[in-house]
Amino acid sequence: MTTQRQWTLENQYKERPEDHELGIREMGRLATWARLKSPWILHFNSGACNGCDIEVLAALTPRYDVERFGITLKPSPRQADIMVGTGCVTRQVASRLRRIYEQMPEPKFVVAVGACGCTGGIFQNTYNVLAGFDKVVPVDVYIPGCPPKPEAIIHGIVKLIEKIKGGS
């Protein structure tokens, strides 16, 4: 014979289908909230003079304190929310760029940095250059300049974060 207290304890931890669905919805909301609060970026250099790379890395230094926006640099595409791309896209690097983009989890965003990343820059009419990042992957934000200042790069990423917040 079971008592009321034993019955309550036994049934308290049984999973119900609606509990599981609620948990999935809550986890989805939690993941979205975390991405908005702390976007992780992946820096992808497709080639060129490296001027934009220096400015992107300068933007990540303590002087500019991008961590106040939650921005963190990650080494793996599987951990990144935003790809920050620099340099013109060549035929040789296009397949690698596409593969790395596909490895990023949804939702994923791309920021093209510099004249080369946006349009191909001075290399755009050469035989081996496809042009900017938008020829291979969808680009959400363009940050022109040769090279753009760290403040402009930070501003572009922050605008993307605001755009993401507005859409959710």
What are the language-model segments listed below?
Residues 85-87, 113, 145:
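Short His-Asn-centered micro-motif
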Residues 118-134:
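Glycine-rich, charge-decorated loop segments at or immediately adjacent to ligand/cofactor-binding or catalytic sites
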Residues 94-96, 121-123, 153-154:
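Short glycine-/acidic-enriched loop or helix-start segments at secondary-structure transitions
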Residues 82, 112-113, 117-118:
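Hydrophobic cores of alpha-helical transmembrane segments in multi-pass integral membrane proteins
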Residues 73, 85, 90-93, 102, ...:
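Metallocofactor- and cofactor-centric catalytic cores in central/energy metabolism, strongly enriched
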Residues 57-58, 80-87:
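Short, basic, glycine/proline-bearing loop/turn elements
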Residues 96-111:
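A short, gly/pro- and small-residue-rich
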